[in-house]
Amino acid sequence: MKKKFLLISLSVCVLTASIIGCGSAGAVTEPDTTTQETEADDTAAPSSQETEVNQDLSADAASVKKMIDSLAINTDAFQPDSAEISEYREPVTLARSLFDNLPEEDQKTLDADGTLTLLVQAEARVLNLWIRDTPLDSVEDGGITWIMEERYDAVSEALGEDTAKELVPLYETKFLPYNDLIPGFQEEKRENLKAGQEVDAAILDMDPSDADAVAEVAKMYDNLTDMQQAYVEHYSVLRDALNKKEDFSNIIYSGTRSSVYGLGDTWLLPDEWKQVTDQLQEWYPQTQTIMVWIIGSLSGMGCNLEFTPSSDVDTEALAKQYIYFSEPDRENHLSHEEYFKYFDDNNIKVYLQVEPGFADVDTLIDLIMDQYGDHPCIAGIGVDVEWYHGVTEDSGLPVSDALAEKWDKHIKEINPEYRLFLKHYNIRYLPPAYRSDILFVNDSQGFGSPVGDALGTYDENLDDVLGFFPEFKHFTDAFPDNDVLYQIGYASDESWFYTMDDPVVLSLGQRLSEVTKQNCGIIWVDFTIKDPKTFPFTQSSADRIKSANRLLGCLNPDEEEGGLVGKRLAGVSSDPALPRDTVFVEKVREIIDSLTDEEKNALDPERLTYLDFAESAVAE
């Protein structure tokens, strides 16, 4: 999905120069600037006026000024054609985040003395490197080009159009020509959707007992391209009519994601996690159970590791590097050590994931493996790239080949059997060429439909919307020689995956298997583990009430705050009501009716009116 974020500045005076979103407030610390050091002092001595200004700076502002003044990307040593982007981009991004955290008076002072201009110039050069390293030749690029355009516009407004052209020459020669490709991508999507819908309609119209009719529809399906087949929503009906006994053998992993924030207030105990993974094993018996286990979550400008380190770890020094420590505090949450001991004994493999922020990934790896590397269950380390050098939603930086290779080799130096996984919803944030045995993970969400016939949470133009299965196919096709993991099951997708055959976890995974050529894995996100259509045995009465209220919210008909289904049924969406909307309403009614009287009485009364409205709308 093309998820979007806002570019926000804390100060009106620097609004147009705010190229990266604001970070969380905190004391400024000086990072390791090895890659930023200049070989010669080419900075002129400060004037008396500048000295006076500097004396007015707080210690934090002075530190930020020193950091910006030393950015190597603004020196003659910088070679734009050959520079490795991560060596220059990361210091600039950190400097911006620290600048945005300064009080408004300090920001104004650094604007007045020219420091902010130096920062924006550095950001402009980084943007040029980003354009240089992005193919800008496929539909996936649409998920990042709008960010590039906003950043170029901000540079242009802050520094002037002529300076922007000088610092970002690839904007005109490489970026702008991409716009000429967009109509072709949109037409291709329309053609693929049309072809898929024609076959889908034939599937629904055929008599499954008529062998000739089934064979004819099967021929229609086989004549589609691989991508067009991903637009066929009801292929399972044809599969059943053909009596095809698919083994879905390319699904070789199954499991769940675990986070301190995903399950709500009450966590699962080790044997309860195993009940969930046992159910997945029943659905996918050929798979290795794996857990995507978040051990380091975003905190402030860095990463909080959820354990108490050994006494020889200098936690104060690490805090200055944006690495913090605290034990999880959710009800029923045991220490990670206790979970891993249980997983050791039950053949459950674990990938330890971090949301690094501005923390150094290699350092995080060392700390985590020093703590847990003796557990046989540990299979590797994962990085959620959405939070790599980013602390606001979707502001993380793309991982270059050099960076991916560095992390991969670092992990394998610890244990050659360990694997790295990299997670993002857009392939352009993942290494363009370096592969090794990296697991690539897609956690895209917010789709309006499985096949791109309706707008999703983040969408504006239906012609740009691929849909769940086509988008995941685009992702997996980008890494044909590597295993991929699909982190799926987000609540923002329930309004369409609830309409699939029960069990929905199996139906969703099977269709993903069919559009995937290589080995893959199904990772169910913890947000909807406690859900009536996924793993209902994990639900308490409070969980049943919570999930029912959430589902009722999908039927809200309000034009501004409503749910996707509710708005379509109310006629206030740009999309018409769809046949699957009727199925979803029926599913919600079944769930409400399954509640006890006490649970029904605890539901939000206003949300219950949404169901009344929806049932009336589909009955018309």
Predicted feature locations:
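Aromatic-lined substrate-binding rim segments of carbohydrate-active enzymes
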Residues: 299-353, 400-403, 407-418
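Beta-rich interaction/scaffold domains
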Residues: 50-245, 539-620
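Active-site groove signature of glycoside hydrolases
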Residues: 293, 371-398
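Substrate-binding cleft/loops of secretory-pathway carbohydrate-active enzymes
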Residues: 359, 364-370, 426-454
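Aromatic-lined carbohydrate-recognition surfaces of secreted/lumenal glycan-active proteins
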Residues: 348-362, 408, 412-430, 483-493
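Catalytic domains of carbohydrate-active enzymes, especially glycoside hydrolases
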Residues: 246-301
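Substrate-binding cleft of secreted/luminal carbohydrate-active enzymes
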Residues: 452-540
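Sec-dependent signal peptide cleavage junction
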Residues: 19-35
